[in-house]
Amino acid sequence: VARVNYLGQDRSDIANTVKELSKDMCNPTDCSMQKIKRLGRYLKNQPRFVLQFKYQEGCENITVWTDTDFAGCVKTRKSTSGGVVQLGSHTIRTWSTHQSVIALSSGEAEYYGMVKGSSVGLGIRALMKDLGWEYHKSIEVKTDASAAIGIANRIGVGKVRHIEVNQLWLQSKVLSKDLVITKVDGGLNIADA
């Protein structure tokens, strides 16, 4: 599983499967073995997965797309967050992870997904700066959840006092215009799996 976990960083087509396999490794079952064999057969039949970057004129925008499956795990009731980061029209990062806390509402789960996506976007901007590319625009974070956008655009917790305090940094980044949160239709959200 360690090898497919390493491979899953570069192969967005197996990201969700790798997440599920990693979750099963603390207590593997026969079903876990079937999953890893199925993944092995898939990788044998699809040995090459290539992200082809065509030339684009002036790719100066970082866009983060996020989506969350609220309480998707029937055992733990934890939500799954997924996302895509694009530089211009090129996809440069994808992920699918279980959230560490149990969300009490779908808006809260989507907010936690936006926090994850925003941290990835800001990390990519910092990497670009280290490579000598200054990026002074706001990072656009797109989601299909109005409630999560409302939480991100306010200051403080308001009526959602149960949100983890360490997740509220997103509000200050929105206020300082480092991030711009926009709503996208659920059918057009490319992070929706």
Please name every model-derived segment:
Residues D10, P28-C31, E57-G58, R77, ...:
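Secondary-structure capping and boundary motifs in well-ordered enzyme cores
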Residues N16-T17, C73-K75, T94-W95, I151, ...:
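Short helix/loop capping segments that flank catalytic or ligand/cofactor-binding pockets
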Residues D24, N61, T97-A193:
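RNase H-like nuclease module associated with reverse transcription
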Residues R41-T68, W133-Y135:
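Structured nucleic-acid-interacting core domains from mobile-element enzymes and related host factors
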Residues V4, N61-G107:
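RNase H-like nuclease fold core
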Residues N45-F49, T91-T94, G123-D130:
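Conserved helix-loop functional segments at active or binding sites
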Residues S32, K44, K78, G117-V120, ...:
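Active-site-proximal structural scaffolding
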Residues V1-L51, D185, D192-A193:
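C-terminal reverse transcriptase regions that engage the nucleic-acid substrate
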